[in-house]
């Protein structure tokens, strides 16, 4: 093994250890869609039980990721029934995929010398946002990692592999399509041989996943793309779920990349070394700023590109001042490590390491109850719960917050919802009706003091994101279920 390969191996080991430590020691959900759009649908495919959100009632999501998760869940069921087993295995695989950011950063900086490669790869290994998002089971994150690797491979002349990864990224997150297309256009321009190689690698992937899989899953090719656009853009679902100002993403970048002016200058300098990546990041931010509904995860492609471009910018700056080559990389590495640690552990971003922790822990506690025959859930929005993903028991769940056909202001369609057990719908009793049918469940998740006289608390949980809300408790009443 060469010295540079050994250096990269050490960085990858550090990066993977940090990412695994994050999800093994910090129970958190990056976003509720992670549970209900992907884990929950995988659980439903594997075991027949799960909450079915409107996206899967209407068929605007690809079944690719849920099917992959379902396979892992079935395999882990041969070992044990702990839901954290399959959750952590899937998170571990996603964390392994996230290491492509470290590889790309290191390899792109090698031209400036060993210390430049260590600085850039090291920054990608320890940057807090990359560690936080790495284990996330979200198409935005997985597609971004595929896209980053594709752009680097295309730059190395491996167009067919790049095309295959671009096709996969497009099928996972078609909203990244314009950004990746702009980046590839910069790389390839009028080189028709490279375009042909990209098409040879990418078109079969797109046809197989977007065309055939959607046809088998939903009855029409590419339905997860065109119906998604119809529902969210033309029928107003996306905007009805929330609007943010055009300053939403700049405000996040100001916090996540503080001190932004210094790091932004490094990004600009680094963009000269990897312009395609800078184009992809810039187009992602511009296009998503124009969309009313904004969430940080939507622009993860830009967030992942940031540390690479910052490292390349610092590497170019160090190269310009030879007298700094021995001292600057070490000093910059220490400073960036401390900065990453500070941003991860100080408000306002520190609270997200415990996002929905109490909710997940309550469902995990219910999983461990041998006498469980039915579970009631109060005081939590249905998509903030752990669902069957974290309960992983073949018993009915009854949600107080249940609307079978939610109508959002500004949207022309109703969002249909269902709870399935053994492939059959579980009748729900929303609102006050849940208390009237407590014979159907003998365990109840509710805020402390809101369970009723017949229920005794077994364990209570809280987290930083609950604020002043009462702890969330798992309660039990004597007897079984009617």
What are these regions (language model features)?
Residues 6-32, 126-128, 172-175, 202-218, ...:
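Transmembrane signal-anchor helices characteristic of membrane glycosylation enzymes that use polyprenol
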Residues 10-17, 118-120, 124, 166, ...:
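Transmembrane alpha-helix segments characteristic
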Residues 31, 58-61, 129-142, 296:
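Short acidic/glycine- and proline-prone juxtamembrane loop motifs at membrane-interface regions
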Residues 8-16, 203-208, 274-278, 282, ...:
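Signature aromatic-anchored transmembrane alpha helix within multi-pass, membrane-resident enzymes
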Residues 174-189, 194-265, 277-278, 289-290, ...:
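Membrane-lumen/periplasm interface segments of specific transmembrane helices
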Residues 13-16, 88-115:
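Transmembrane-helix motifs of polytopic, lipid-linked glycan transferases
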Residues 104-107, 122-127, 142-165, 305-309:
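Specific aromatic-rich, kink-prone transmembrane helix
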Residues 27-28, 215, 323-473, 477-480:
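Catalytic lumenal/periplasmic loop and adjoining terminal transmembrane helix
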